[in-house]
Amino acid sequence: MFGPRHFSVLKTTGSLVSSTFSSSLKPTATFSCARAFSQTSSIMSKVFFDLEWEGPVLGPNNKPTSEIKAQSGRINFTLYDDVVPKTARNFKELCTGQNGFGYKGSSFHRIIPEFMLQGGDFTRGNGTGGKSIYGEKFADENFAKKHVRPGLLSMANAGPNTNGSQFFVTTVPTSWLDGRHVVFGEVADDESMKVVKALEATGSSSGAIRYSKKPTIVDCGAL
């Protein structure tokens, strides 16, 4: 069970604030897209990432095997335009690149198994950069959606009202992030969640990617 001393905020500096965050205390969760996605009330815009990476091949029940190889796959996302329209628009336009910059060619720079995948730093690639379509930072829109399950899309930040382009995808429920990070979308389907699990297997408890080819967004856009 998580208590107040285990609260950690996902920062855009590439490190967790609290040194007491322990992988042994993270909740274990099973994931069923059919159950989770059917309960979603805000089905709006859809976008995608096409990714390439090196890492373990998944076996039964999406568990990593000892076989390591170059892989590729797609993650489809559904955005909550009706709940957080400004945040959803930012992510969508960074996917399309219509403003002359965006996620294409960037990588997931920080992955912690049984926690999350963090990406979106397309200027520096290490968790210290990125920018929004509105300028450098924009305010937290609201915290209506909670981090209640795997497969949720949420904004990484450097504190209140410091949203840019960095985001994370949960791989377990992360309720200690509620009220601190804006949830603005979700992984759209089971096949996409399999890709999330494959990317999760490339990470480590420190967040460092364990293989030479980081998970890279080779293409992205709107569906």
Curated annotation (Swiss-Prot):
Keywords: Cytoplasm, Isomerase, Mitochondrion, Rotamase, Transit peptide. Residues 1-44 form a transit peptide. It is found in: Mitochondrion; Cytoplasm. Binds cyclosporin A (CsA). CsA mediates some of its effects via an inhibitory action on PPIase. One of its GO terms (molecular function) is cyclosporin A binding. It comes from the Eukaryota. GO terms for cellular component: cytoplasm; mitochondrion. InterPro entries: Cyclophilin-like_dom_sf, Cyclophilin-type_PPIase_CS, Cyclophilin-type_PPIase_dom. Signal peptide: none annotated. It catalyses: [protein]-peptidylproline (omega=180) = [protein]-peptidylproline (omega=0). Pfam families: Pro_isomerase. One of its GO terms (biological process) is protein folding. Belongs to the cyclophilin-type PPIase family. This is Peptidyl-prolyl cis-trans isomerase, mitochondrial. It comes from Neurospora crassa (strain ATCC 24698 / 74-OR23-1A / CBS 708.71 / DSM 1257 / FGSC 987).
